[in-house]
């Protein structure tokens, strides 16, 4: 499994998990976060490997569709880059650093 795809799916899952069904959440979390094989997930839920595979592929598409429409992950990346640039440019500005910490904590709650 590609590490970039795994990282992206884990990130999208963090942002959009609440919009998935319980089964979709379970399969994606086991497959991407816990590194279970299709066979292990199938055994855990008493279904075929093909059923697990189909569900995971559908859920990947759903997560990508949510990101295409809502842009929560890509916006988070842009905000993080901007915060890093500001902190790098103004390392001694305590007020600015406090404000960025507040904004970062808001991002972490969502």
Curated annotation (Swiss-Prot):
InterPro entries, per database record: RNA_pol_sigma_r3/r4-like (IPR013324), UPF0122 (IPR007394), UPF0122_fam_protein (IPR054831), WH-like_DNA-bd_sf (IPR036388)
The protein's superkingdom reads Bacteria
Family matches, as Gene3D superfamilies = Winged helix-like DNA-binding domain superfamily/Winged helix DNA-binding domain
Record's function text = Might take part in the signal recognition particle (SRP) pathway. This is inferred from the conservation of its genetic proximity to ftsY/ffh. May be a regulatory protein.
Family as reported in the entry's similarity comment: Belongs to the UPF0122 family.
What is the name of the protein in this document? UPF0122 protein SPG_1182
Identify the species of origin. Answer: Streptococcus pneumoniae serotype 19F (strain G54)
């Amino acid at each position: 499994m590609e590490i970039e795809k795994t990282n992206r799916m884990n990130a999208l899952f963090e942002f959009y998990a609440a919009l998935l069904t319980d089964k979709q959440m379970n399969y994606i979390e086991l497959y991407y976060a816990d590194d279970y094989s299709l066979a292990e997930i199938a055994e855990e839920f008493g279904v075929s490997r093909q059923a697990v595979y189909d569900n995971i592929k559908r859920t990947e598409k759903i997560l990508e569709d949510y990101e295409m429409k809502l842009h929560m992950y890509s916006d988070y990346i842009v905000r993080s880059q901007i915060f890093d640039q500001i902190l790098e440019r103004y390392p001694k500005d305590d007020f600015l650093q406090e404000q960025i910490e507040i904004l970062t904590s808001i991002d972490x709650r969502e």
